[in-house]
């Protein structure tokens, strides 16, 4: 499906707009650059992208956050972004560099970390914390495989007077992961 590339340094910026072809996305990757002395705006970016995805018809929408952590500069709470993420139907996937020595310092960073944690859990997404930016490429390759091999399962229960309390889904191979939204 269509893919877009959004930068989060200083403010959310569309680097490559939604396109089904890889050429525009590859060109956008060439325009990604560091923005020193500015805080990331992860909360705002997820909020904006989720709002845009809610207006689009998409079979399997996903938001992928690739971040080196650091200070959050959105200045807002996580709840609105979490609500919009739910309304969009998108899954949230996060790959982030985490330094073992880094601690959460301010409220905005705690808000971002809460959004990433709850967003992944609530949407059936995934999160991978890596210790160095050199691990981004293998982590993104794993995520690409995960996204490429997803299937939508629709379940309709038989008409009974008392509905079942739960639905159990199993896989023949233990290598399969099940996620639900």
Spell out what each predicted region is.
Residues 3-5:
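Conserved alpha/beta-hydrolase fold motif
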Residues 9-103, 114-117, 121, 125, ...:
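Exposed acidic/Ser/Thr-rich ligand/metal-binding surfaces
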Residues 108:
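Extended, alpha-helix-rich binding/interface surfaces that flank or overlap catalytic cores
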Residues 127-129:
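His/Asp/Glu-enriched short active-site or ligand-binding loop at hydrolase and phosphoryl-transfer sites
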Residues 132-181:
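C-terminal "exit" segments of structured domains
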């Amino acid at each position: 499906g269509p893919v877009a590339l959004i930068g989060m340094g200083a403010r959310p910026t569309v680097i490559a707009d939604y396109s089904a072809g890889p050429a525009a996305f590859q060109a956008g990757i060439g325009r990604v650059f560091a923005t020193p002395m500015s805080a990331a705006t992860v909360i705002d970016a997820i909020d904006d992208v989720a709002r845009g995805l809610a207006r689009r018809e998409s079979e399997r929408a996903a938001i992928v956050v690739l971040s080196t952590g650091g200070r959050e500069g959105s200045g807002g709470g996580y709840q609105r972004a979490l609500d919009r993420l739910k309304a969009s139907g998108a899954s949230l996937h996060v790959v982030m560099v985490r330094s073992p020595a880094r601690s959460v310092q301010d409220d905005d960073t705690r808000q971002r970390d809460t959004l990433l944690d709850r967003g992944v859990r609530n949407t059936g997404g995934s999160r991978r914390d890596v210790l160095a930016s050199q691990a981004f490429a293998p982590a993104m390759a794993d995520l690409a495989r995960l996204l490429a091999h997803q299937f939508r399962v629709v379940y309709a229960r038989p008409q009974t007077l008392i509905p079942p309390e739960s639905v159990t889904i199993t896989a023949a191979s233990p290598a399969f992961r099940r996620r639900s939204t």
